[in-house]
Amino acid sequence: MKENKKAILEILKKKSKKDGKFENLVLNLALQKIDSDSFEFDGDAVYTNDKKRLVYCMSQEASFAIPEGVEIIGEMAFRGKKALKNIIIANSVKEIEHDAFYDCDELDNVYVPAGVKVVKSYAF
């Protein structure tokens, strides 16, 4: 299991356009907390294996659409994404956790559907 976690971390590091200390810290914590068989990476973000929780976004794009099926935007999932300007939250999302979009200074346009029932403190 340890080798599997290390291999996944290496893949995520290579996919990251900026290999910053914060991203490495978040990825290491995610790998320690979550069994490696419990999440997947689609090239832009890390999700739980059932794709109901967005754990961490690695995209450096100005716009991001959270895919349908995601129910929870995880704590610090988008934290520090300086280039992020537009976010479209899928209708399936029910909860936005603490600090999910913290330090996204350029975030200008957010679509939050009516189905979002919980927005925890400091989410934005």
Positions of predicted regions on the chain:
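Structural signature of tandem-repeat unit edges
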Residues: 1-47, 52, 57-72, 81-95, ...
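Consensus positions within tandem repeat domains that build extended binding/scaffold surfaces
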Residues: 74-77, 97-102, 120-123
